[in-house]
């Protein structure tokens, strides 16, 4: 396919890295020049151009601008009715983006994560998932959502990633101070968390780790008594309320 990217930020760059080896002709905008140059250096089928040339050379266009910049930038561009647009933006609805890219339709809003560069990542999709599935589904899991309300809820819940990473980093620091190989200690914890959650539903995993008096049960009960669950739900509610 002929793919174009308007706004070559971190997530859009990761997405293109994940599929650049599949034979697509990819044209990316000069925005975030370091990311664009890295793609062209690593993949001979990726080129850099100004925004309008990106459109002229593309049949599928990924729009990955900051929501506040999108109206100003997109209004200056001429889209074609035969193009398909995938928005990677939050803070601006697919309908609002479609008004800016007309006559090209927005077929989906897609929210990947940095791991999409290597595969094995979740990708949230609102709209028609077929095109996203065709491009990314071989290496990643596509989660198709019903409507904008579901997208908003998923956006809030995915913020769990940062606190979980913080907890793993803190535990790795604690462990690393007590063993000879601190990098190995962190690698162990990351592998432990990732593999355990990948292989079992979370509630089932909690029960499997609920041996009376065991290390896992004792630490979980300590964390729960400290208000971990209430703090998490309060934080999610605050995100949902726009805080």
Protein language model regions, located:
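Rossmann-fold NAD(P) dinucleotide-binding segment
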Residues: 46, 50-101
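NAD(P)+-binding Rossmann beta1-loop-alpha1 motif at the extreme N-terminus of oxidoreductases
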Residues: 1-56, 173-177
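NAD(P)-dependent Rossmann-like dehydrogenase/reductase catalytic/cofactor-binding core
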Residues: 105, 187-243
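Internal alpha-helical scaffold of NAD(P)-dependent oxidoreductase catalytic cores
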Residues: 42, 96-106, 121-199, 242
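Short, positively charged
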Residues: 19, 77, 113
């Amino acid at each position: 396919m002929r793919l174009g990217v308007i706004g070559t930020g971190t997530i859009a760059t990761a997405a293109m890295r994940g599929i650049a080896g599949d034979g697509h002709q990819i044209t990316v905008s000069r925005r975030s020049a370091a990311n664009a140059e890295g793609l062209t250096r690593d993949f001979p089928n990726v080129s850099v151009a100004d925004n309008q040339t990106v459109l002229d050379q593309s049949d599928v266009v990924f729009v990955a601008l900051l929501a506040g910049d999108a109206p100003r930038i997109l209004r200056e561009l001429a889209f074609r009715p035969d193009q398909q647009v995938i928005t990677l933006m939050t803070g601006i609805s697919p309908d609002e983006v479609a008004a800016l890219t007309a006559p090209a339709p927005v077929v989906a809003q897609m929210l990947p994560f940095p791991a999409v560069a290597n595969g094995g990542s979740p990708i949230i999709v609102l709209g028609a998932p077929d095109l996203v599935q065709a491009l990314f589904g071989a290496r990643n899991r596509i989660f198709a959502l019903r409507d904008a309300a579901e997208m908003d809820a998923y956006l809030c819940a995915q913020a769990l990633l940062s606190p979980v990473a913080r907890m793993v980093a803190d535990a790795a620091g604690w462990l690393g101070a007590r063993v000879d190989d601190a990098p190995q200690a962190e690698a162990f914890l990351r592998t432990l968390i990732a593999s355990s959650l990948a292989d079992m539903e979370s509630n089932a995993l909690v029960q499997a780790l609920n041996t009376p008096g065991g290390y896992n049960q004792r630490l979980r009960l300590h964390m729960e008594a400290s208000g971990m669950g209430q703090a998490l739900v309060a934080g999610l509610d605050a995100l949902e309320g726009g805080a």
